Amino acid sequence: AIRRRLLEGAPAVDYPEELIRYQQGMGRLSGGGLYRLSVDGGEGCAAAEYTDGESVLFKELLLSPDKMGRGLAALERVLPGARCYVRTPALWDGMKGSYLQPFGMIKWYSAEKRALWGEGTHGYMGLGFD
């Protein structure tokens, strides 16, 4: 419910409940999971997995851009790691010293649907199940 509300109106992949639960299980296997955040009155959510013994992959972090830094700091207290990778919609410039890297792609097999998408539109894949 939180995820859908935060992505409402954005071009994003909408996952059914069973896939969200699948992600929850995958996260737990590695020591992560699904998280609900409250930062300065703003609500958010995250899906995290440990990729190895010291790196955390936030497969999704949804929070308003002005609260991302504080949200990550709160998550780091629960999920410590030497390094973290964070996937967010294309609305956040990242942390100081970080770099941005596109994730996922879309290939249209229908010219009609491609025309509806619009040039320059940034979609959000989210969890990705990689």
Regions found by a protein language model. Give the residues of each.
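Amide-forming acyltransferase catalytic core, primarily the GNAT-like/NAT-type
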Residues: A1-K67
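Active-site/acyl-donor-binding loops of N-acyltransferases
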Residues: E49-T51, K59-G69, A73-D130
